[in-house]
Design a protein with these regions (language model features):
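Conserved alpha-helical scaffold segments that buttress catalytic/binding sites
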Residues: 97, 101, 111-201
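Metal-dependent C-N hydrolase catalytic cores
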Residues: 1-138, 147, 201
């Protein structure tokens, strides 16, 4: 199984588990902890990822991610902007898109060591999520297959950013099972949100 990753996933200077864990996991995989998995660089999908980010997120936010200005918008996901943020966002998105393309091309499994996705909204980052590669990859998948694309989000927090970006798109079914009400939302259409521990979390 191909699992996509490159060092740009960890290009952000802010040292935090969301910005670092993919590198540690890739190293462990390279050392044989996941037999049958091959770590693959998504470099061939970087140009497409840039196009998808520009099509999905507001122009002012994209420019802030590239330049750091305005500073508050550039760091809206919760950590300080630096020049590595844009590379991280683009390459992490490239990995998710590459994994979708690989799975559809082979009919098998594929993955990406991307993180920090489902809280990001059109106009800014939220909850340590910079851009929403999850919504972008699902939208990309609708261009490659007929039928319904399913997002199964099992993160502890709700994916309110994903809902904002793809909620109501009849080609995508968003199923969100969470243990915390952080970033909760009212699902659209057939989408579902279940929070296991109630609204006080």
């Amino acid at each position: 199984m191909k699992v996509f990753y490159n060092e740009a996933y960890t290009a952000a200077a802010h040292a935090f588990d969301t910005t670092r864990k993919s590198g540690e996991i890739a190293t462990a995989m390279d050392e044989g902890c996941a037999p049958g998995c091959e770590v693959v660089d998504p470099i061939d999908f970087v140009d497409l990822a840039e196009e998808l980010i520009e099509a999905t997120h507001a122009p002012a936010y994209v420019e802030a991610l590239r330049t750091g200005e305005p500073y508050d918008l550039a760091g809206s996901q919760g950590f300080s902007w630096d020049e590595g943020i844009w590379d991280m966002a683009v390459n992490s998105t490239a990995g998710v898109v590459a994994a979708v393309d690989e799975a559809l091309a082979t009919g098998g499994s594929s993955g990406s060591l991307s993180s920090g996705l489902h809280h990001a909204r059109r106009a800014g980052g939220v909850g340590y999520c910079t851009v929403n590669g999850l919504a972008m990859a699902a939208t990309r998948a609708t261009e490659l297959v007929s039928g319904t694309v399913v997002i199964l989000d099992l993160d502890a927090h709700c994916g309110g950013g994903t809902n904002e970006l793809i909620g109501g798109d009849g080609r995508i079914l968003h199923l969100d099972l969470s243990t915390s009400s952080f970033d909760s939302y009212s699902p659209d259409g057939d989408d579902e949100l279940t929070v296991l521990h109630g609204p006080s979390d």
